[in-house]
Amino acid sequence: MKRSGGLFLTSLLLTVLACTLPTTAPIVAQAPSTLASALDPVAASAPPAPGNLAEPAADLAALYREVDPGVVAIWTFGSVDGAHETSVPLGQGTGFVIDTQGHIVTNQHVVADAEEIEVDFPSGMRAWAEVLGTDLDSDLAVLKVDVPADRLFPLPLGDSDQVQVGETVIAIGNPFGLSGTMTSGIVSAIGRTLDSERASPGGQPFSSGDILQTDAAINPGNSGGPLINLQGEVIGVNRAIRTESFTVSGDAANSGVGFAIPVNIVKRVVPSLIEEGHYDYPYLGVSSLSQSTLNLNTLERLKLPADTVGIYVTCVAAGGPADQAGLRGAGACENGDLLPGGDLIVAIDGHSLETFNDLISYLVSSTQVGQQIVITVLRQGEEVELTLSVGARP
């Protein structure tokens, strides 16, 4: 049967594993870690960053030895209708240690619907975990295990704002249950946008910005594992793959296009998940698209200048922050048709914006709920400044 391409979350359902691996004895996975002491750069017990070695192959071998102890395999269990056992395997993914207090970062979709969660460490140690908090928007979750601090190896967190296209990276995880697997590649692109795991009041999914794209092989089971630079720092959390390839059993297979949540989002979201169990995302209440994605015919129909970049507002949510501030949409809230009349957002607080990702990135990294911001829009050829109070995503 011919299958069309699509985007796949990379946790591994055990119905897939059952075709190739026994579910009675899960394969132990390696554990990465970082985010120590509420996101201090490196935990006290974190292994030192690998030195500069002469041979690239030796570099990667040393890097693996340093970071692998911080990567863990995550197994989820729950109830299934018709099952005789009280708890049956549901799925498997990857996570990494972020501090010596037992906090582990993974994807939200890895632990969704789990009633019990087992964490397997590279040393052979296993522990039950509890979920402290989840975030559907970023697809992040924080787990807590009761493990002695001297047996945890937190991974240092890097700075995803410094990531460059072409930079060499590695991914460590448990693809198809093969624990401790390392793959390497490069950062293929930065600033991608992915749909959130939840929908806005209008029915369209919220968006996650600043997503990293990599060609390092990411497959089912890699979800929640770290994307690591050559300095041994986590720069992203592996989340999804886009593929047109499938295994003989019908499962999505890697085709060189993987996506990772930037670590700077992790730094911002995870402390709130630990303390409060959730994170409130800044919210404007608009649907929009990058003007750069429109061709000349569309620009002329919408009466937009071809020499100005920005974010075209297609819809403004009634009663939302943008609506209260007087932002104008094109009235495409119901049918999604591209109509003229919407504002073109060109700046926030004096910072120029060119793409929809720029808008999402600025809101998440530079604003918080309740903050007053100034939005500059192009309206009928004139620049207009509007003051807006940032809301929280409903």
Model-found features: residue ranges?
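Bacterial N-terminal signal peptides that target proteins for export
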Residues: M1-L9
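C-terminal motif of bacterial Sec signal peptides marking the signal peptidase cleavage site
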Residues: V16-A18
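Bacterial signal peptide processing site
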Residues: T20-P22
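Serine-dependent protease modules
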Residues: T24-V309, F356, V364, G370-Q371, ...
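Conserved PDZ fold ligand-binding element
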Residues: I104-V105, Q324-N357
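Acidic, Ser/Thr/Gly/Pro-rich low-complexity segments that form flexible
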Residues: C315, G319, L327-A330
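Surface-exposed loops/turns
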Residues: A318, Q368-V369
